[in-house]
Amino acid sequence: MLGGFPQTSRIDLQGSSNFLTKLRRGKAQTTRESLPPLERVADCGAGIGRITKGLLLGVANKVDVVEPVKKFTDELVQSLGNGEYAGDGEGNRGKGQVGNVINLGLQDWIPEAGAYDIIWNQWCVGHLTDAQLVVYLQRCKDGLKKTTEGQETSKSCIVVKENLSTDPKHKDLYDDEDSSVTRSDVNFRRLFQEAGLKIVATELQKGMPKELFPVRIYALRSA
């Protein structure tokens, strides 16, 4: 998904970090004080852990990874530093740890109810049909922590960050080689609505090479 451009991963992770910080601070909060760590998040379609290691371990105490390919998660776990994998039984001095390693496809994963501050989905939902995506998002919605009244920065959400179709008529683009779909912004919004979700923040990723599809990030909560 990074298109062979080595600088793209850094640009992507920085954009995601900035988006998440703005989302957690909320419109009314301009303080530069550091935010408390999130308790538990999920990295879905985690692969070898680029987002887990490059972003989520820095903002959360526990990161569960959901990835169907076991050799990818084995590589992820082997690449972690001392104390970064809860399965080793070591603490990590207040820093984030990888918690559960779940080798399932998104369509088969049922999140623990009310467990997660953030469920992060990036470059993975294109392998789900529209119907599967709606059901999956509904399950993710049930997996979010319930918000405590008045705790604006602790509001949980689903994050979806994906390539967008560039079709002038907003049609989805299908790739027969890997059986994936690149959806239009219009279709994403329709599917989010079908799943009972509202968009609370969204922006285009800046700085990506023009040769690649545009990338948009959405933060979603129950409508």
Each language-model region and where it sits:
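Class I (Rossmann-like) S-adenosyl-L-methionine-dependent methyltransferase catalytic domain
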Residues: 1-114, 128-141, 148-223
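A conserved beta-strand element that flanks and buttresses the S-adenosyl-L-methionine
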Residues: 120
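Hydrophobic adenine-recognition pocket in adenosine-nucleotide-binding enzymes
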Residues: 124
